[in-house]
Amino acid sequence: MYVIEITYTAPLERVDDALEAHRAFLGQHFEAGVFIAAGPKVPRNGGVIVAAGIERNKLDEILATDPFAQQQLARYDVTEFKATRLAAGLNLPLPA
């Protein structure tokens, strides 16, 4: 499982111009079951994505297709962790 912290490196006006395409990117990967949570940070200087069920190299390939990455609007910091406990109702595979 991964926590992806996105930090904007461009002015919000430029980020906002790419926001619709970024949301479409998120939607595609929610539908594929890779992203399980996402949203803006407070204050709005970036965002956070939680991803699961994918190898790190594949995740890196996916993140490279984000319009924010393609337009060099943000930096991505990826932290992998082993979830050993999940809230009731989250039906995600836990690592062995």
Report residues per predicted region.
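Conserved, structured core segments of small domains
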Residues: 1-96
